[in-house]
Every structure is written in C-alpha cells, then in structure tokens.
C-alpha cells in the first residue's frame, strides 16, 4: 500500500528487509526478559498481598539478578546464532551486515536495560505502583522513542539503526527511572488487595 511505498522511499528496501529479519530475531532474544515479567508479578504480588514489604524487597533484588543473568546469557546465545538464523533468508551481504548491527544493538540493551524497564516494572505494578509505571512508559514512548526515531532515523538519516537506537534509549531511560523508583521504596506505600 501507500505506507509501504513511503517506507521504501524513506529507508530503502535493504533496510526494511534487515529490520524485518532483525525483528524476528529480536522476538527470540526478548523471550528471557519477557518470561520473567510474570514471575515478578506473581512473587512481588504475593509478598505485598501478605503485607511483607521486606520479602518483596528481597525478591526484587533476587529476581532482578536472575533476570540479568538469564537475559545476558540468552541474548549472547541468540546473537551468536544470528548468522545461522540468517541462512533461512535470501539476503544480500549489505542487508546481512545491517541485521548483525541491529541484533547487536537490541541484544546488548535487551540484556542490560530491559530487565529493569520490563520485568522490574512488572514488579512495581504488582506492588500497586501502577500509575507511576504507566505514566513513565507513555511519556518515555512519546518523548524518547518517537522523537528520537524521527530525529535519528529520518532527520539525521540513520535509518533503521537510528530507530533501534531510539528504542534502546527508551528502555534505558525507563530502566533508570524504574530502578530509582524501586530503590526509593515508594512502591511499599501502596495497598495491594
């Protein structure tokens, strides 16, 4: 459709192809961090439901360490397997190089920032800190991801690399804010039903 024509004019076919392949690989890489989200919800929710903020604090730390470890190992494995995954696609060398860069950018930050911006934020929500996490996520998506995507991807002509950088900047900012929020203990003041 018209949107596809517009995207091809903005980024070019090889960038669109690389982005499509990279996103398929990203979905595999994201599994470790995403899988830990419900663990945070269950464990932190149980602790807070029992009125045991100290246990919740303990499990926040423990689950965050576990998530970082699992995410790091899994993202490294997926990155190392990327050349194998690309064999399933008919890609030009230029496109393959771009896929490698996109997966590298994603996986480094998926291992380092997403455990805080994703899984840890689920724990905050389970503790009743729902509005804060929602506002931060919405504002960060608009102010960081959208604006940086436009600035880096289109204005500075970085293409899909710029958009990937905008995405990981969004994760990184959320990670810092949610880590600070968890450390502040403010989440302990909410009533969980």
Functional labels for PLM-detected ranges:
Residues 19-82, 114-138:
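Small-residue-rich hydrophobic transmembrane alpha-helices
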Residues 8-27, 94-100, 129, 163-165:
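Interfacial/gating helices of multi-pass transporter permease domains
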Residues 82-83, 145, 149:
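Alpha-helical transmembrane segments of polytopic integral membrane proteins
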Residues 10-13, 50, 126-128, 157:
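Helix-loop interface residues and adjacent transmembrane-helix termini in multi-pass membrane transporters
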Residues 44-110, 153-193:
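Short alpha-helical transmembrane segments in multi-pass integral membrane proteins
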Residues 1-6:
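Short, small-residue-biased leader/transition segments that mark boundaries at the very start
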Residues 34-37, 106-126, 132-142, 148, ...:
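Short runs within selected transmembrane alpha-helices of multi-pass transporters and secretion channels
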């Amino acid at each position: 459709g018209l949107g596809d024509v517009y995207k091809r004019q903005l980024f070019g076919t090889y960038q669109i192809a690389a982005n499509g392949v990279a996103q398929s690989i990203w979905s595999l890489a994201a599994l470790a961090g995403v899988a830990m989200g419900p663990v945070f919800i269950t464990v932190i929710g149980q602790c807070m439901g029992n009125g045991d903020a100290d246990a919740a604090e303990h499990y926040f730390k423990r689950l965050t360490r576990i998530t970082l470890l699992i995410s790091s190992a899994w993202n490294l494995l997926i990155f190392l397997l990327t050349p194998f995954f690309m064999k399933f696609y008919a890609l030009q060398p230029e496109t393959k190089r771009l896929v490698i860069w996109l997966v590298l950018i994603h996986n480094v930050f998926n291992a380092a920032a997403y455990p805080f911006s994703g899984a840890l934020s689920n724990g905050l929500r389970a503790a009743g800190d729902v509005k804060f996490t929602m506002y931060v996520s919405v504002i960060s998506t608009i102010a960081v991801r959208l604006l940086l995507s436009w600035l880096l991807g289109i204005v500075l002509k970085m293409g899909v690399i710029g958009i990937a950088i905008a995405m990981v900047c969004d994760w990184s900012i959320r990670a810092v804010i949610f880590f600070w929020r968890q450390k502040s203990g403010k989440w302990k003041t909410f009533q969980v039903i």
